Amino acid sequence: MVDQLESEIIGIIKNRVESEGGDGETALIVGDLTAATELTALGVDSLGLADIIWDVEQAYGYQDRDEHGRGVVGSPERRRHSGSHPRLAH
């Protein structure tokens, strides 16, 4: 049985893969996506994985913190201040 969190994350992955415009075979796999589906079968490479992680962080408001409770480089809080996607930030 699929729980709500799993379902939401699968939805995030589907949205990302579909927005990247996968081929016809990928579209068939995306339609049957489960927690057991390997991301490589969807054509997700390391950069695509980083995008999926970014999407999940944004959806759930995840923030990396250091031992002093400050936002660390790469955290959503830090990215909000830079105003750009982490791949585009300098």
Swiss-Prot record:
Keywords: Nodulation, Phosphopantetheine, Phosphoprotein, Plasmid. The modification O-(pantetheine 4'-phosphoryl)serine is found at S46. Residues 4-89 form the Carrier domain. Residues 65-90 are annotated as: Disordered. It comes from the Bacteria. Residues 78-90 have a biased composition (Basic residues). InterPro entries: ACP-like_sf, PP-bd_ACP, Ppantetheine_attach_site. 4'-phosphopantetheine is transferred from CoA to a specific serine of apo-NodF. Proposed to synthesize nod factor fatty acyl chain. Involved in trans-2,trans-4,trans-6,cis-11-octadecatetraenoic acid biosynthesis. This is Nodulation protein F. It comes from Rhizobium meliloti.
